[in-house]
């Protein structure tokens, strides 16, 4: 087995399969046309007619010493450029993790053909990041969210492998640095620094235990219902929902319907009966959404264990079928009450709808009302939303522009929605066995979904 084959095998072992497959596809179908490497491990760039190193040993030693001096006792280091991989190999023994960012597939090929990094790749000591990989954001969020990384994110700095990269890849370095900062900020924003929310959630959970024990165990729901149907619709409460209501009513008998709590009143108003309604809020305001609940409709309410006890108690007294469900977060799993089952609730109720649909083995999950942006009138929700169609404009959350549905220009979103969108993209990317069909026909573009007309969707998957 060649050195390159060993390195690719290490990547394909679960370390970084997308890059492993990309390298394998390259060597099977292409050859290096821009770069080559000589017996002294110096790389020649045919485009700029220049060698990467003028004095290879001296330059590698310079960057080696420079990086070590700036990173005493650092658990990880980020470096742009794989070079000939000698610097990477030498530095790896000093850190728990070494992240190497590169945009040139040929440089990956040449470096991994000459230097055996298979042991470091398999152990996680070296992680190669292909900046052109479609799922690079997902990869970085998973890496940065690890316990031995999270606590040290404040020491992040991008180091450069060699002046060659500074000269010819300056824009790529800036772009990589921007991507890393965005993902670090997203990971940090997930933190609850003063634990107030966490403590409220745990307090609610302890108060909800009696009704959790009296009602349907979530695990039983999954065991009895998974795999029964192929297609479902997840109904969210964005401003685009209003226009989809007539079609939803027409085709409601053809699909299993998952509904976020805030959209429930609109469905009831139009005689649409969802199969599932989900809630995870630790405050009381969702009571506004459930004033018209009817036990005869047989809608099953899936409530997070952290849902406010007043909401749980209200629905229970109304004799509404419900399940108080544990989050898959570690504190709940440590209770070892596995007979009740766990669900990945995420931070937004829509996220819980998708993970429930995934747990029930739906193959086609259709999204409507998932705008994640303001509409042209500045509304954050549909017209008759119980808390006000412009409720998000009062929250003073920083706003930003993002790519619009269909790729047609940009729309105005805010930071919380933008974070949520990225988490959804992570979820969808991790579940590629499911067809996620975005039939919102408005709002922000969500990657790893197929944008499709809602009427066409209904006709195709009914």
Task: Report residues per predicted region.
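Short gly/pro/ser/thr-enriched loop/turn and capping motifs at secondary-structure boundaries
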Residues: 105-110, 264-266, 284-287, 308-310, ...
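Conserved phosphate- and dinucleotide-binding cores of soluble alpha/beta proteins
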Residues: 347, 356-359, 364-405
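Acidic, glycine-rich loop-and-beta core segments that form the ion-binding/anion-interacting portion
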Residues: 260-262, 269-270, 276, 286-287, ...
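N-terminal donor/sugar-recognition subdomains of glycan-related enzymes
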Residues: 1-232, 239-255, 285-298, 309, ...
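Alpha-helix C-terminal capping segments
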Residues: 93, 265-272, 356-364
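Classical protein tyrosine phosphatase
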Residues: 100, 265-279, 377
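Conserved acidic E/D residue at the C-terminus of a beta-strand in Rossmann-like folds
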Residues: 100-105, 278-281, 303
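Active-site/ligand-binding-proximal alpha/beta "capping" segment
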Residues: 309-368, 372
């Amino acid at each position: 087995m060649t050195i390159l084959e060993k390195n690719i095998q290490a990547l394909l072992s679960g370390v970084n399969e997308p890059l492993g497959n990309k390298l394998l596809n390259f060597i099977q179908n292409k050859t290096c046309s821009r770069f080559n490497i000589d017996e002294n491990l110096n790389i020649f760039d045919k485009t700029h007619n220049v060698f990467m190193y003028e004095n290879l040993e001296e330059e590698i030693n310079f960057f080696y010493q420079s990086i070590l001096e700036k990173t005493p006792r650092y658990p990880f280091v980020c470096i742009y450029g794989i070079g000939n991989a000698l610097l990477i190999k030498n530095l790896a023994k000093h850190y728990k993790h070494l992240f190497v960012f590169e945009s040139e597939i040929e440089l990956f090929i040449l470096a991994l053909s000459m230097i055996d990094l298979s042991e470091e790749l398999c152990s996680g000591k070296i992680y190669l990041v292909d900046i052109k990989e479609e799922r690079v954001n997902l990869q970085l969020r998973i890496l940065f969210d690890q316990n031995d990384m999270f606590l040290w994110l404040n020491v992040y700095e991008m180091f450069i492998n060699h002046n060659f990269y500074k000269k010819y890849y300056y824009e790529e370095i800036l772009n990589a640095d921007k991507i890393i900062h965005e993902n670090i900020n997203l990971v940090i924003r997930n933190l609850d620094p003063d634990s107030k929310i966490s403590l409220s959630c745990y307090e609610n959970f302890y108060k909800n235990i009696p009704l959790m024990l009296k009602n349907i165990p979530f695990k039983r729901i999954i065991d009895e219902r998974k795999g029964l149907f192929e297609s479902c619709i997840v109904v969210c409460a964005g401003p685009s929902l209003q226009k989809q209501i007539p079609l939803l009513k027409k085709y409601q008998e053809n699909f299993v319907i998952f509904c976020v709590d805030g959209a429930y009143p609109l469905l009831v108003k139009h005689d649409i009966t969802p199969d599932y309604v989900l809630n995870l809020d630790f405050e009381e305001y969702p009571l506004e959404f459930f004033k018209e609940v009817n036990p005869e409709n047989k809608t099953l309410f899936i409530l997070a264990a952290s849902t406010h006890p007043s909401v749980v108690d209200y629905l229970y007294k109304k004799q509404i079928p419900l399940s108080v469900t544990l989050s898959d977060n570690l504190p709940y799993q440590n209770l070892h009450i596995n007979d009740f089952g766990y669900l990945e609730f995420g931070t937004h109720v829509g996220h819980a709808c998708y993970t429930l649909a995934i747990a029930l083995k739906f193959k086609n999950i259709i999204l409507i009302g998932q705008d994640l942006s303001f509409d042209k009138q500045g509304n954050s929700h549909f017209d008759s939303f119980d808390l006000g169609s412009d409720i998000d404009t009062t929250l003073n959350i920083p706003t930003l522009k993002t790519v619009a549905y269909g790729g047609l220009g940009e729309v105005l979103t805010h930071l919380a929605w933008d974070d949520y969108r990225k988490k959804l993209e992570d979820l969808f990317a991790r579940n590629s066995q499911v067809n996620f069909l975005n039939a919102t026909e408005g709002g922000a573009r969500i990657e790893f979904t197929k944008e499709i007309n809602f009427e066409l969707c209904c006709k195709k998957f009914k």
